[in-house]
Amino acid sequence: MKVYIETMGCAMNSRDSEHLLSELSKLDYKETSDPKMADLILINTCSVREKPERKLFSEIGQFAKIKKPNAKIGVCGCTASHMGADILKKAPSVSFVLGARNVSKISQVIHKEKAVEVAIDYDESAYAFEFFEKKAQIRSLLNISIGCDKKCAYCIVPHTRGKEISIPMDLILKEAEKLANNGTKELMLLGQNVNNYGVRFSSEHAKVGFSDLLDKLSEIQGIERIRFTSPHPLHMNDAFLERFAQNPKVCKSIHMPLQSGSSAVLKMMRRGYSKEWFLNRVERLKALVPEVGISTDIIVGFPNESDKDFEDTMEVLEKVRFDTLYSFIYSPRPFTEAGAWKERVPLEISSLRLERLQNRHKEILEEKAKLEVGKTHVVLVENRREMDGQIVGFEGRSDTGKFIEVTCKEKKNPGELVRVEIISHSKGRLMATTKGN
């Protein structure tokens, strides 16, 4: 039996797809990259914005046309959670619907016609996803929590993934050790608010915080680097930032989702912090780790966002000079506070704001890239670079999250840590050669 999985959206969804495959492997399913050959087609969905949700029904239609006569189509993930049985009504070719909090039930629902399992109070945190042998990965994803207790006015995630629960540390360490034994060098820890880890477990467990978890993971032999996403700025107190700075295996790059640079908009968004708080946290972080790489999310066109509000966002962009920017026009979502508001920023204005934001960020990246020439970084080799069938180097990321293309004559294998020197840049991209390895 063969399964094809189409994954939309975030890293959390990618990890959920791995869990789906893990469960199905117990029933002797093998993954295929060709949906035409699959006995089971799974679409793991995203509902953070409207666009991927619209794409879902287009994908269902395409798969229905090309699938084998008896193949089943299942819709999983966040859109499944909030649309539930409505998906079956809109797309009769779908055999079952499986919500984001119900991944472990996949082996049950594939045997039920028109099944709908979308309860968000189902506790998957106590479920030990069994490690299954797969192709060795240099970088692996690892859940440390599920759900979200925040009530951001624009976000549907609490409705699709339920209340926040931390996964017991012993299960996390056990899986991390198995990943390390299978060749993983870098862990990416996943959670809606990873740095809030330990606030609530599904059952009685010894109190442990996120920084303690990072320290324990750092002790695992074979794990060279640890990253995490997505932390919440509200939980970036001095103690957390100091532990982040001190742990040598924790990469010195961090995601700090700003969302807006306007304190007024942040208040409407129910983010719990102000522009001043955010800038204070960045200042403290850079004092501890001057070379830190910072990425962020920004939403433009949030209801009632004024010209001044947007200028506040541009001001924060100039002050922080983010290394990576994920930026979007506000998308109203069902079951959210802001989704019910009548006030809307005209699309033309939102589009112009987004264009200006992104263009300025591109300029900032170019300015920062110029300053990198002559500097050295340690890169984790991810892929070899080839030209005319010959290996000419490799590419990978630095500790600070910079993607670097390296030219070298020596053969370097994926998973190696290699010191390189930046020699040039192009449109924000960094090029390097090996140095003193």
Curated annotation (Swiss-Prot):
Q: Which GO terms describe its molecular function?
A: 4 iron, 4 sulfur cluster binding; metal ion binding; N6-isopentenyladenosine methylthiotransferase activity
Q: What SMART domains does UniProt report for this protein, alphabetically?
A: Elp3
Q: Where does [4Fe-4S] cluster 2 bind?
A: 148, 152, 155
Residues covered by the MTTase N-terminal domain: 1-115
Q: Which domain of life is it from?
A: Bacteria
Q: Radical SAM core domain: which residues?
A: 134-367
A GO cellular component term found in this entry reads: cytosol
* Cofactor descriptive note: Binds 2 [4Fe-4S] clusters. One cluster is coordinated with 3 cysteines and an exchangeable S-adenosyl-L-methionine.
Q: Does this UniProt record's set of keywords contain Lipid biosynthesis?
A: no
- Which cofactor does this sequence's record say it needs? [4Fe-4S] cluster
Tell me the enzyme class: transferase
Q: Where is the TRAM domain?
A: 370-436
Q: What is a single Pfam family found in this protein's UniProt entry? A: UPF0004
Could you tell me the EC number(s) of this protein?
Answer: 2.8.4.3
Instruction: Specify which residues bind [4Fe-4S] cluster 1 according to the UniProt entry for this protein.
Output: 10, 46, 78
Q: Where in the cell is it found?
A: Cytoplasm
Keywords in alphabetical order, please.
Answer: 4Fe-4S, Cytoplasm, Iron, Iron-sulfur, Metal-binding, S-adenosyl-L-methionine, Transferase, tRNA processing
Tagged with keyword tRNA processing: yes
Q: Which reaction does it catalyse?
A: N(6)-dimethylallyladenosine(37) in tRNA + (sulfur carrier)-SH + AH2 + 2 S-adenosyl-L-methionine = 2-methylsulfanyl-N(6)-dimethylallyladenosine(37) in tRNA + (sulfur carrier)-H + 5'-deoxyadenosine + L-methionine + A + S-adenosyl-L-homocysteine + 2 H(+)
Q: What does this protein do?
A: Catalyzes the methylthiolation of N6-(dimethylallyl)adenosine (i(6)A), leading to the formation of 2-methylthio-N6-(dimethylallyl)adenosine (ms(2)i(6)A) at position 37 in tRNAs that read codons beginning with uridine.
What do we know about how this protein assembles, alone or with others?
Monomer.
By sequence similarity, the record places it as follows: Belongs to the methylthiotransferase family. MiaB subfamily.
Protein name per its UniProtKB record: tRNA-2-methylthio-N(6)-dimethylallyladenosine synthase
Which organism is this entry from?
A: Helicobacter pylori (strain J99 / ATCC 700824) (Campylobacter pylori J99)
The root-end lineage is: Bacteria, Pseudomonadati, Campylobacterota, Epsilonproteobacteria, Campylobacterales
